[in-house]
From Swiss-Prot:
Homotetramer; composed of two disulfide-linked dimers held together by non-covalent interactions. May interact with matrix protein 1. This is Matrix protein 2. Forms a proton-selective ion channel that is necessary for the efficient release of the viral genome during virus entry. After attaching to the cell surface, the virion enters the cell by endocytosis. Acidification of the endosome triggers M2 ion channel activity. InterPro entries: Flu_M2 (IPR002089). It comes from Influenza A virus (strain A/Silky Chicken/Hong Kong/SF189/2001 H5N1 genotype A).
């Protein structure tokens, strides 16, 4: 007797999906949420540098200058730069003994 005759092969019915209530609204909603979660996770991993850099630094740019005349923009830049510039005479040299 051959060994091949003793081996059982799976029938087609065993490989089919056994979920009879896959049209249940809860199952459909869970599937949609799962797919959306996967898509968002992939996008997050692909663009995380852009997204988090925009959130971290994009909100700290200061007031928008859209619609402001160029002369006022230049004046604002000069005020900001003068606030940053420091005269060397203001520093105090402290020597520790």
């Amino acid at each position: 007797m051959s060994l091949l005759t003793e081996v059982e092969t799976p029938t087609r019915n065993e490989w089919e999906c056994k979920c009879s209530d896959s049209s249940d609204p809860l199952v459909v909603a869970a599937s949609i949420i799962g797919i959306l979660h996967l898509i968002l996770w992939i996008l997050d991993r692909l663009f995380f540098k852009c997204i988090y850099r925009r959130l971290k630094y994009g909100l700290k740019r200061g007031p928008s200058t859209e619609g402001v005349p160029e002369s006022m923009r230049e004046e604002y830049r000069q005020e900001q730069q003068s606030a940053v510039d420091v005269d060397d005479g203001h520093f105090v040299n402290i020597e520790l003994e």
